[in-house]
Amino acid sequence: EEKHLIDLEHIQARDRRYEFIAGLDVGYRDENVFVVMATNGEEFYLVDEYVSNETTTSTLAEEIQEKVDEWGIDSIYIDSAAQQLKADLAYDYDIYCENAIKSVNDGIAAVQVLIENDKLLVDVNKCGHTYSSLSSYKWNPKTENPKPVHDWASHASDAVRYAIYTHQKRSVGIFAV
Protein backbone atom coordinates (compact mmCIF):
# COMPACT_ATOMS: atom_id res chain seq x y z
CA GLU A 1 0.00 0.00 0.00
CA GLU A 2 1.11 3.54 -0.65
CA LYS A 3 0.89 4.37 3.06
CA HIS A 4 4.20 2.52 3.43
CA LEU A 5 5.87 4.85 0.92
CA ILE A 6 6.86 8.00 2.80
CA ASP A 7 9.58 10.61 3.06
CA LEU A 8 12.18 9.26 5.48
CA GLU A 9 14.33 12.37 5.41
CA HIS A 10 14.23 12.47 9.23
CA ILE A 11 16.44 9.36 9.35
CA GLN A 12 19.94 10.67 8.91
CA ALA A 13 22.93 8.58 7.93
CA ARG A 14 24.88 7.27 10.90
CA ASP A 15 22.10 8.22 13.36
CA ARG A 16 22.95 5.97 16.31
CA ARG A 17 19.31 5.71 17.36
CA TYR A 18 19.14 3.15 14.55
CA GLU A 19 21.11 0.15 13.51
CA PHE A 20 21.87 0.20 9.79
CA ILE A 21 21.75 -3.11 7.96
CA ALA A 22 21.78 -4.13 4.31
CA GLY A 23 20.62 -6.96 2.08
CA LEU A 24 22.34 -7.99 -1.14
CA ASP A 25 20.77 -10.15 -3.82
CA VAL A 26 23.13 -10.99 -6.63
CA GLY A 27 21.92 -11.65 -10.14
CA TYR A 28 24.63 -12.79 -12.48
CA ARG A 29 22.39 -12.34 -15.52
CA ASP A 30 19.67 -10.52 -13.62
CA GLU A 31 19.92 -7.37 -11.56
CA ASN A 32 21.99 -6.91 -8.41
CA VAL A 33 20.10 -5.21 -5.61
CA PHE A 34 21.64 -3.73 -2.47
CA VAL A 35 19.14 -2.30 0.03
CA VAL A 36 19.95 -0.23 3.11
CA MET A 37 17.65 -0.28 6.12
CA ALA A 38 17.54 1.50 9.44
CA THR A 39 15.97 -0.36 12.33
CA ASN A 40 15.21 0.45 15.93
CA GLY A 41 14.53 -3.20 16.71
CA GLU A 42 10.82 -3.03 15.97
CA GLU A 43 10.41 -1.01 12.80
CA PHE A 44 12.42 -1.25 9.60
CA TYR A 45 12.94 1.75 7.33
CA LEU A 46 14.14 1.17 3.79
CA VAL A 47 16.33 4.25 3.33
CA ASP A 48 18.48 3.58 0.26
CA GLU A 49 19.00 1.19 -2.63
CA TYR A 50 21.46 0.41 -5.39
CA VAL A 51 20.24 -1.52 -8.43
CA SER A 52 22.44 -2.59 -11.34
CA ASN A 53 22.53 -5.04 -14.21
CA GLU A 54 25.58 -7.05 -15.30
CA THR A 55 27.91 -5.05 -13.07
CA THR A 56 31.54 -5.97 -12.52
CA THR A 57 32.59 -6.99 -9.04
CA SER A 58 34.75 -3.88 -8.73
CA THR A 59 31.87 -1.55 -9.64
CA LEU A 60 29.50 -3.36 -7.28
CA ALA A 61 32.10 -3.21 -4.48
CA GLU A 62 32.62 0.51 -5.08
CA GLU A 63 28.87 1.20 -4.86
CA ILE A 64 28.47 -0.95 -1.74
CA GLN A 65 31.44 0.75 -0.07
CA GLU A 66 29.90 4.17 -0.78
CA LYS A 67 26.69 3.08 0.96
CA VAL A 68 28.61 1.53 3.88
CA ASP A 69 30.59 4.75 4.34
CA GLU A 70 27.54 6.98 3.95
CA TRP A 71 25.18 5.11 6.28
CA GLY A 72 27.56 3.40 8.71
CA ILE A 73 26.13 -0.02 7.90
CA ASP A 74 26.63 -2.54 10.72
CA SER A 75 25.75 -5.77 8.88
CA ILE A 76 25.36 -6.85 5.25
CA TYR A 77 23.36 -10.01 4.61
CA ILE A 78 24.09 -11.67 1.26
CA ASP A 79 22.44 -14.48 -0.65
CA SER A 80 24.20 -17.60 0.65
CA ALA A 81 24.43 -18.90 -2.94
CA ALA A 82 26.83 -16.03 -3.78
CA GLN A 83 29.88 -17.43 -1.97
CA GLN A 84 32.39 -16.39 -4.64
CA LEU A 85 31.20 -12.78 -4.55
CA LYS A 86 31.17 -12.86 -0.74
CA ALA A 87 34.81 -14.03 -0.76
CA ASP A 88 35.82 -11.49 -3.43
CA LEU A 89 34.22 -8.63 -1.49
CA ALA A 90 36.00 -9.69 1.70
CA TYR A 91 39.47 -10.44 0.31
CA ASP A 92 39.73 -7.83 -2.44
CA TYR A 93 37.67 -4.96 -1.01
CA ASP A 94 37.48 -5.47 2.79
CA ILE A 95 33.67 -5.62 2.63
CA TYR A 96 32.42 -8.33 4.96
CA CYS A 97 29.04 -9.96 4.44
CA GLU A 98 27.13 -12.55 6.44
CA ASN A 99 25.21 -15.35 4.78
CA ALA A 100 21.50 -14.65 4.78
CA ILE A 101 19.13 -17.19 6.24
CA LYS A 102 17.31 -18.38 3.14
CA SER A 103 14.16 -19.80 4.67
CA VAL A 104 11.98 -18.43 1.87
CA ASN A 105 8.47 -18.86 3.26
CA ASP A 106 9.41 -17.88 6.83
CA GLY A 107 11.32 -14.87 5.53
CA ILE A 108 8.43 -13.74 3.37
CA ALA A 109 6.08 -14.18 6.33
CA ALA A 110 8.36 -12.02 8.51
CA VAL A 111 8.34 -9.22 5.93
CA GLN A 112 4.59 -9.58 5.45
CA VAL A 113 3.95 -9.21 9.21
CA LEU A 114 5.98 -5.99 9.25
CA ILE A 115 4.04 -4.60 6.29
CA GLU A 116 0.65 -5.57 7.77
CA ASN A 117 1.58 -3.89 11.07
CA ASP A 118 2.96 -0.74 9.38
CA LYS A 119 6.46 -1.53 10.63
CA LEU A 120 8.17 -1.53 7.23
CA LEU A 121 8.33 1.90 5.64
CA VAL A 122 10.00 2.80 2.35
CA ASP A 123 11.64 6.11 1.44
CA VAL A 124 9.65 7.64 -1.42
CA ASN A 125 12.67 9.59 -2.68
CA LYS A 126 15.35 6.89 -2.70
CA CYS A 127 13.76 3.45 -2.94
CA GLY A 128 11.21 3.49 -5.74
CA HIS A 129 12.50 0.34 -7.42
CA THR A 130 12.35 -1.73 -4.25
CA TYR A 131 8.91 -0.39 -3.39
CA SER A 132 7.64 -1.37 -6.85
CA SER A 133 9.22 -4.80 -6.44
CA LEU A 134 7.60 -5.42 -3.06
CA SER A 135 4.27 -4.28 -4.48
CA SER A 136 4.61 -6.66 -7.45
CA TYR A 137 5.88 -9.79 -5.66
CA LYS A 138 3.80 -12.81 -6.68
CA TRP A 139 3.34 -16.45 -5.74
CA ASN A 140 3.45 -19.16 -8.40
CA PRO A 141 0.01 -20.83 -8.42
CA LYS A 142 1.36 -23.77 -10.46
CA THR A 143 3.69 -25.20 -7.83
CA GLU A 144 2.61 -27.86 -5.35
CA ASN A 145 4.30 -26.08 -2.46
CA PRO A 146 3.98 -22.30 -2.37
CA LYS A 147 6.93 -20.63 -4.11
CA PRO A 148 7.40 -17.05 -5.23
CA VAL A 149 7.62 -16.29 -8.94
CA HIS A 150 11.18 -15.59 -10.08
CA ASP A 151 10.84 -12.38 -12.09
CA TRP A 152 12.02 -8.75 -12.07
CA ALA A 153 10.36 -8.15 -8.68
CA SER A 154 12.05 -11.01 -6.86
CA HIS A 155 15.58 -9.57 -6.56
CA ALA A 156 14.83 -6.45 -4.54
CA SER A 157 12.25 -8.36 -2.53
CA ASP A 158 14.83 -11.05 -1.77
CA ALA A 159 17.38 -8.43 -0.66
CA VAL A 160 14.79 -6.98 1.74
CA ARG A 161 13.92 -10.46 3.01
CA TYR A 162 17.59 -11.35 3.57
CA ALA A 163 18.17 -8.21 5.62
CA ILE A 164 15.02 -8.34 7.72
CA TYR A 165 14.67 -12.06 8.39
CA THR A 166 18.35 -12.74 9.03
CA HIS A 167 18.68 -9.70 11.26
CA GLN A 168 15.60 -10.68 13.25
CA LYS A 169 16.82 -14.26 13.70
CA ARG A 170 20.36 -13.24 14.64
CA SER A 171 19.09 -10.58 17.07
CA VAL A 172 16.87 -13.13 18.81
CA GLY A 173 19.83 -15.52 18.97
CA ILE A 174 21.84 -12.97 20.95
CA PHE A 175 19.32 -13.08 23.78
CA ALA A 176 18.57 -16.81 23.65
CA VAL A 177 19.52 -18.79 26.74
Where are these regions (language model features)?
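A conserved active-site cap/scaffold subdomain adjacent to cofactor or substrate pockets
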Residues: 20-24, 31-34, 48
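Short, well-ordered loop/turn elements at secondary-structure boundaries
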Residues: 16-18, 28-31, 71-72, 116
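Charge-patterned, long linear interaction tracts outside catalytic cores
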Residues: 150-177
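Residue-level detector of short, conserved catalytic/binding motifs and their immediate flanks
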Residues: 32, 74, 157
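Mg2+-dependent endonuclease catalytic cores in nucleic-acid-processing enzymes, primarily RNase H-like
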Residues: 40-148, 170-176
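ATPase catalytic-site recognition across NTP-hydrolyzing enzymes
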Residues: 1-24
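Short beta-strand scaffold segments in enzyme catalytic cores
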Residues: 32-38, 161
